[in-house]
């Protein structure tokens, strides 16, 4: 479990591709201070398992499905990435519940600075937006963000200058692809309500069927 509060940005040192999978070696300082084999670290919002490490770098394996569903294929040596260690039981909870299981990607279509905030318009699938709500939470490349605008195929988030300077938001431009994880609570609620509606519909059909057939 993560919070969406990025601890530091790391630098891609090496990318090893094997078939449809890959291994990433990432230079970092803070997240490697107490790292152990098997630890979970969110890389641009994606929960990945540490398979090797040294003093100032660590390696993670990326499965084919993760490569396909995220923006990791766009990384190259020298790319910056957002990093967050899994939340400890006694840690502070500063963002929102983030699983590290990315739902898909979005394209940045507009960036506008207003006063002390920067607004990002993100184009994404209606399959993702249907679980979102205004003023709700969404994770963008591992950053816990608040939704200020919402339509069937777009979301607007507002980011403060501190977050931009401390994360890879500072490298983003119109056309950039970002990883998206929708709010976990919203997804569960949508699933629950959708399944309840289906159950009611099925019950109505079944009762009508029996009635029409003399039962």
Curated annotation (Swiss-Prot):
Reactions catalysed, as given in the entry: 2 6,7-dimethyl-8-(1-D-ribityl)lumazine + H(+) = 5-amino-6-(D-ribitylamino)uracil + riboflavin
Gene3D superfamilies: 2.40.30.20
EC numbers, comma separated: 2.5.1.9
GO biological process: riboflavin biosynthetic process
Pathway field: Cofactor biosynthesis; riboflavin biosynthesis; riboflavin from 2-hydroxy-3-oxobutyl phosphate and 5-amino-6-(D-ribitylamino)uracil: step 2/2
GO molecular function: riboflavin synthase activity
InterPro entries: ATP_synth_asu-like_sf (IPR023366), Lumazine-bd (IPR001783), Lumazine-bd_dom (IPR026017), Riboflavin_synthase-like_b-brl (IPR017938)
Residues involved in 2,4-dihydroxypteridine 1 binding: 4-6, 144-146, 158-163
EC class (word): transferase
UniProt protein name: Riboflavin synthase
Lineage, top ranks: Bacteria, Bacillati, Bacillota, Bacilli, Bacillales
């Amino acid at each position: 479990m993560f919070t969406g509060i990025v601890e530091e940005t790391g630098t891609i040192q090496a990318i090893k591709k094997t078939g449809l999978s890959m291994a990433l070696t990432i230079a970092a300082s803070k997240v490697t201070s107490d790292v152990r084999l098997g630890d979970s670290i969110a890389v641009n919002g994606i929960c990945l398992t540490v398979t090797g490490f040294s003093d100032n770098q660590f390696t993670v394996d990326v499965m084919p499905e993760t490569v396909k569903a995220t923006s990791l294929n766009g990384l190259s040596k020298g790319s910056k990435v957002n990093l967050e260690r899994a939340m400890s039981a006694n840690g502070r909870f500063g963002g929102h519940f983030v699983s590290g299981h990315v739902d898909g990607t979005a394209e940045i279509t507009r960036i506008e600075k207003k006063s002390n905030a920067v607004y990002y318009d993100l184009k994404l699938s209606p399959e993702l937006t249907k679980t979102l709500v205004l003023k709700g939470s969404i994770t963008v490349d591992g950053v816990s963000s608040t939704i200020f605008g919402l339509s069937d195929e777009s979301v607007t988030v507002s980011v403060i200058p501190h977050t931009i300077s401390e994360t890879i938001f500072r490298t983003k431009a119109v056309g950039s692809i970002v990883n998206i994880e929708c709010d976990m609570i919203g997804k569960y609620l949508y699933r629950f309500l959708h399944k309840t509606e289906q159950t009611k519909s099925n019950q109505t059909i079944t009762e009508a069927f029996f009635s029409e057939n003399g039962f």
